A protein has these predicted regions:
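Basic, often amphipathic N-terminal segments
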Residues: 2-95, 103, 118-172, 189-198
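Portal/gating segments that form or line small-molecule/metal binding sites
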Residues: 99
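Short histidine-centered catalytic/ligand-binding loop motif
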Residues: 110-118
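Active-site/acyl-donor-binding loops of N-acyltransferases
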Residues: 182
Length: 198
């Protein structure tokens, strides 16, 4: 069973402002995106901040940690559905915790929450996927993170720091118990597979 989630460009970029085009995604191409949703009570704070800054709804898929991204081919599609794929990603569930507001500038205009806990686990899963499918679409090193927005103003970044940097650890923690595989073309996310972590 597949589901397609349509999002506006604003929601898709997780951006409270009109975002520039992604430096990684090429128009007209389809990608495999393996992500972990930020779930539980603590995601509400993130979604509320995005909603307040952006106005309007924030799609649930917008708050996640990208684990791996690569251009989708027919052979890759078959590999994702295979039992080998499940075996390679046989990983225990883990706790993750976001830290302070950081930026990828000047490489790209993305502000994000770094990961204080769970970073090593995300990096290990990413490396398993690199070993299976190759380096992927990103032209820069993998940094597990939760995107706050793209093209934010300095005022918005300062506000994000006020809201997120001082939160106690229990309000920044979430459980990673599933990985979600999506086919993504820059606008629509079509769920291909959900992998429960044990």
């Amino acid at each position: 069973m597949t589901c397609t989630i349509e999002m506006t460009a604003q929601e898709n970029s997780s951006s409270p402002t009109t975002a520039p085009v992604s430096p990684t995604l090429k128009p007209g191409r389809r990608y495999l995106s393996v992500i972990a949703h930020v779930s539980g009570e603590n995601v509400q704070r993130l979604e509320e901040w995005k909603r307040a800054v952006a106005g309007g709804a924030v799609a649930p898929i917008s708050t996640h940690v990208t684990v791996y991204l690569t251009e989708l081919t027919e052979s890759l599609l078959a590999a994702v559905q295979s039992s080998q794929f499940r075996e390679v990603l046989d990983t225990p569930r883990f706790e993750a915790r976001w830290g302070s507001v950081r930026s990828f500038r000047p490489v790209t205009e993305v502000e994000y929450l770094n990961l204080e806990a769970g970073k090593t686990e995300f990096e290990q899963i990413h490396q398993k996927l690199v070993a299976l499918f190759g380096a992927g679409a990103a032209s820069f090193p993998y940094v597990p993170h939760v995107t706050l927005g793209q093209g934010l103003t300095q005022e918005q970044v300062d506000h994000a720091r006020e809201v997120f940097d001082a939160l106690p650890a229990e309000q920044r923690t979430f459980t990673v118990d599933h990985l979600h595989c999506y086919s993504y073309d820059g606008q629509d996310w079509e769920e291909m597979r959900v992998l429960p972590l044990h």
